[in-house]
């Protein structure tokens, strides 16, 4: 049995969403298995004395433009037509990431993760609003929140 690969994720990261959308194909093609590990990306940035690319490159327009270009290329290559930048970005994901841990304990993490990523990066919902998060869950996940 192959050692699983940890996929550290935060729903607030568009890059994590993009990775999530292609991991299934990688698993099918290679036989690898990814274990999803919820983290708070903002906390990781703080711990490592780092900043998000949006903040780090705010004063470097060409770098931000190239980052967006690469994102568009990735989206096109992998046919991720539903992806859209969230108008509420950046979003405080503390609550929905805590629920990701609970969803793992309850055995409904894959469905919860799909719903949260869809709400955040396909539907452009304000996932910082607890009621919107709860409504998103009620639509598709057997998780009482």
Predicted regions and their residues:
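Structural alpha/beta surface segment adjacent to cysteine/selenocysteine redox centers
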Residues: 18-120
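Long, well-ordered amphipathic alpha-helical subdomains in the mid-to-C-terminal portions
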Residues: 128-130
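Local sequence-structure signature of Cys/Sec-based thiol-disulfide redox active-site neighborhoods
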Residues: 1-22
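A generic signature of intrinsically disordered, low-complexity regions enriched in glycine/proline
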Residues: 14, 71, 132-133
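Residue positions that mark polypeptide boundaries
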Residues: 1, 144-145
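Residue-level detector of conserved catalytic or cofactor/ligand-binding positions
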Residues: 132-144
